[in-house]
């Protein structure tokens, strides 16, 4: 039997590496799904409803100039140990300038920084990466391979199409995706056109400042033991739940892009009163979380990540005089939010 030549072997290795890289993309999809789910807290559902949007898209950039207090923090204390929590919001403008002076000053007295969510890993096995890639490709479309127009109620499809024409006119693949993925992709397109991003650039800047000052960053690690099965579970999401997710995203894009921009400016200025008064819709995240949470496997991962963060925050307080944490305001506030849970446990909580 003839052996494989060096050129053929090289081609096979490059092909395997390419597929493994695509598997990493699928792994990122799991991480993104869990990160969004972890950030959702239904306590914000009582926020003022969003008002109808105008025909104007939000401006490309929010720049906050001059001397302002900047983003505000909550103080959680027990004895002489203090946990400072910087509440963040999403989305934020890609090019937003915000005052980080208070964070920099606090880092001089802080022993540890706690990020908002765990580091979610799926392992580095190349065979797992390949399986992830092919599973991810398989679940991109609905099981019956029907297009969105055939799956959605006519009224919802008309609204979806109007938003697509405005924010993603050249994205011809949107109609081929399953409802939940189509909704997520349309949201990304709309935010991009509006100069917004769901990436936590604030946390990125805080961690950069912490590293610069030599402050320890303690991020919990959560390994997904069965990432292929998680993707399969996402692929088995009931169609009705997926359509509800897409419908909530459509409603948010129709009403909330302007308020998103106003919230970003209020956050950067540290204007908590305005931030609290502005419309804030989380219906899309709640609906999409409900969709992916039909999987017990995904639901348990989300619950574990949320519980682990609170445990880590309390542990950090116990071992440090001063700890700085970053956390979504969606998770902080509300009757069932993190701050309420800490109060129940006997901690002193002071708001901005």
Task: Set out the residue ranges of the language-model regions.
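Residue-level recognition of short, well-ordered coil/turn positions
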Residues: 24, 271-272, 321
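N-terminal secretory signal peptides that target proteins for export/translocation
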Residues: 1-18
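A cross-kingdom marker for long, charged
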Residues: 288-352
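Boundary at the C-terminal end of the N-terminal hydrophobic targeting segment
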Residues: 37-52
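Structured, acidic catalytic/metal-binding patches in enzyme active sites
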Residues: 49-65, 70-297
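Glycine-centered signal
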Residues: 3, 18, 37, 279-283
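Bacterial N-terminal signal peptides
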Residues: 22-37
């Amino acid at each position: 039997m003839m052996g494989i030549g060096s050129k053929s072997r090289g081609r096979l290795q490059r092909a395997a590496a390419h597929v493994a890289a695509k598997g990493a993309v699928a792994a990122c999809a799991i991480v993104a799904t869990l990160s969004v789910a972890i950030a959702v807290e239904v306590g914000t559902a009582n926020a003022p409803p969003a008002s109808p949007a105008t025909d104007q898209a939000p401006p490309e950039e929010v720049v906050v100039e001059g001397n302002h207090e900047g983003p505000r923090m909550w103080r959680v204390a027990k004895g002489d140990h203090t946990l400072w929590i910087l509440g963040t919001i999403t989305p934020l403008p890609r090019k937003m300038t915000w005052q980080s002076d208070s964070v920099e000053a606090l880092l001089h007295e802080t022993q540890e920084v706690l990020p908002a969510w765990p580091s979610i890993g799926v392992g580095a096995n190349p065979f797992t990466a390949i399986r992830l890639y092919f599973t991810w490709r398989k679940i991109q479309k609905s099981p019956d391979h029907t297009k969105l127009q055939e799956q959605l109620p006519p009224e919802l499809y008309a609204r979806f199409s109007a938003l697509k024409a405005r924010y993603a006119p050249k994205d011809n693949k949107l109609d081929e995706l399953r409802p939940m993925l189509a909704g997520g992709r349309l949201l990304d397109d709309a935010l991009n056109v509006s100069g917004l991003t769901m990436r936590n650039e604030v946390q990125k800047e805080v961690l950069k400042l912490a590293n610069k000052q030599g402050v320890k960053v303690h991020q919990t690690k959560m390994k997904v033991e069965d990432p292929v099965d998680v993707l399969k579970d996402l692929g088995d999401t009931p169609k009705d739940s997926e359509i509800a997710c897409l419908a909530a995203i459509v409603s948010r894009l129709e009403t909330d892009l302007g308020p998103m921009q106003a919230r970003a400016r209020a956050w950067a200025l540290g204007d908590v009163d305005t931030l609290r008064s502005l419309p804030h819709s989380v219906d899309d995240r709640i609906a999409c979380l409900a969709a992916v949470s039909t999987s017990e496997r995904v639901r348990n991962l989300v619950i574990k990540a949320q519980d682990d963060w609170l445990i880590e925050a309390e542990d950090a307080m116990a071992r440090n005089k001063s700890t700085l944490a970053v956390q979504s305001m969606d998770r902080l506030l509300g009757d069932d939010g993190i701050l309420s849970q800490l109060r129940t446990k006997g901690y002193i909580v002071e708001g901005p």
